[in-house]
Amino acid sequence: MILIDLGSIRNPAANCGVYGFKPTAFRIPTDGWCSIAAGADAIPAVIGPLSTSLEGIKLFMSTVIDSKPWLSEPALIPMPWNYQACSPHQPLKIGVMWHDEVVTPHPPITRALCEVVTKLDAMPNIEIVDWKPHLHSEAWAILSSLYFTDGGEETKALLAESGEPWMPLTSFIVKDNPCVKKLTPKKMYYWQEEREAYRKEHAKIWNDTATGAGGEGMVDIILCPVGPGVAPKHNTAKYWSYTSQWNLLDYPAVAFPVSKVDKEKDNVNEEFSAMTDVDEENHNLCRLFLLEYHAVD
């Protein structure tokens, strides 16, 4: 299955216990597809695969990119698909982001992350370090200001034309979002400058993880939750920053299955202390999500 990602590849993958890959922008051809506000690329949507296997992800990407789509879509990056495994001569350095300092993941997510880290840490060719998140609340302010630069007018017009009602989460991200405003050119330039400044700050943080000259010993991968919980009850998925963060930065990202909810292990923390108001809201949803058949990515 092929989806368009502003979180809409990785979240369905995580909710269903399958693999989902968000490439960087301008990797996969977009001829023949359509979206709301087509041509608005302040935060470009990208196309990527869902699959029941990692091999399916690799097959999709290699097949599409081996066809050299940049010959017909010049905006695409003319770069082959490269698959490079780690080895004793080229160890992998993984930075683990346990939470984003805004919202604490629910117990199944943290447990699954612990299990993955434990297995990776036992491998001789992998180094594990902690990754400190960089101002994710600020990142969300930038991102959500650039999602609907027309103030949501096209979305509102399409819904009015269709006669369909506003769904709760659509209202949440468009109508109720204080950052959604019709931007003047001057404001548009401001937020795009903020986007680029944030990207540079993040790049410096990443580059500073190097332990040797020329970037040697730098973190290769950030391992983190896909979201703050497992598949949510309808109309409750209001915290998007675990996925949208990587859209703002335009980093590739993959969701992969790890486990399922285990009620013997995944107990609600009764002594929980919230970092933020939205963290408290997310914690209060925890009991709704802890169903044993739920996948954990």
Task: Please annotate each region the language model reported.
Residues 13-16, 23, 39-45, 89, ...:
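Short, solvent-exposed loop/turn segments at the edges of secondary structure
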Residues 1-64, 252-257:
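Short glycine/serine-rich loop segments
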Residues 63-244, 248, 258-294:
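Amidase signature
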